[in-house]
Amino acid sequence: MSALFLMKTLGLFIATAIAEIVGCYLPYLWLKEGHSVWLLIPAAVSLALFAYLLTLHPAESGRVYAAYGGIYVLTAIVWLRIVDKSPLSNFDLIGTAFVLTGMGILVYGWR
């Protein structure tokens, strides 16, 4: 597996995770924070983009979903820190490291 392939796959995973998180965060803003119901339109677009991006990944769907989970966790932790402005705990960091280690094992098996 080339470094370029890994970088492209990682970028695709990150874009997919952002599309999913935004697609779920916008309805949260409407339901929990009292923002406009119109947020459901970009949420639906974001979730449709998420589903489309999943089809672009370079392995069988089950393997993609499993490996994608690691990037999703990492992206969610970054979101927690940047968007929610919540400090990260050692448990957040250690748990994320374990998840990413598992993801690395899965991706290594794609060879």
Curated annotation (Swiss-Prot):
InterPro entries found in the cross-reference section: UPF0060
GO CC aspect terms: plasma membrane
Membrane-spanning intervals of the chain: 10-30, 36-56, 64-84, 90-110
Highest taxon in the source lineage: Bacteria
Keyword line: Cell inner membrane, Cell membrane, Membrane, Transmembrane, Transmembrane helix
Localization per record: Cell inner membrane
Protein's UniProt keywords contain Nucleotide-binding: no
Keyword rRNA-binding: no
Family membership noted in the UniProt record: Belongs to the UPF0060 family.
Protein name: UPF0060 membrane protein IL1642
